[in-house]
């Protein structure tokens, strides 16, 4: 057991975890008083699974994210000539272009903090301190930020062979997996579902069935805000959907509303199914008596000295017309963190 009590522990080293560590340092927390735990330190799922996926965030906002934290030292990183800095600011891009500078930031932040390549399995609050238990060690911290990410959701229809989402969303991996004469079902109509449908069409699959619950939703620039900013289709994915989903369906693609009749009729035709129906928080960490406690979606507070950030703990926010969405995206995480971190400093154990 490690005898030191850290001021802050950050669990997770994806974009939200990197932002949290950077902002703590910016606010004067000494790096050696910050415990940072992640099993890989490879920019989370973004770096390990999604780098070949097209973003729905503009390049300009990725650059804003990197420049917003002084301890990121991204001014120095600019000398590295990351490809991100050469791209048109108003365009979207492959996520690999933000992963590379984030990995650079993560690498140097690890040098100035107490970084441990482990997985937290359990946490408990006692004596006004959090104990974080990994397979190898126990650590203590006064405050903990969970930036543990989320996994693709599954619908678990019986008797179907599931093609993993992380394979389907990566066109290169998908091309090595599919058989063109097989039938593939894709569940969903979100950004990722449309990307996967496009992949399958462009790879020449002969029969594709899309099961969906709602029509395509598009992000619309309203000037100083964006309608359906978090849930709407953007960029090249939106253009493709307008032409091929709301326009003329490719000959290989059929679409059906999800209901009992359509599932019974068409699902048996499919050799494999792909679930592109969103994400859900990881559940591989047991937190004392907090298993059924919901986080506050406006403050990120889970309990005293315990906070959540990132895709597993997004801010809930209404647009000017009252439509409420979860704010998911790197720049949105940063804006939210800037707003709530002063509260976190006061809401200790």
Where are the regions a protein language model picked out?
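N-terminal FAD cofactor-binding segment of flavoenzymes
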Residues: 19, 23-80, 214
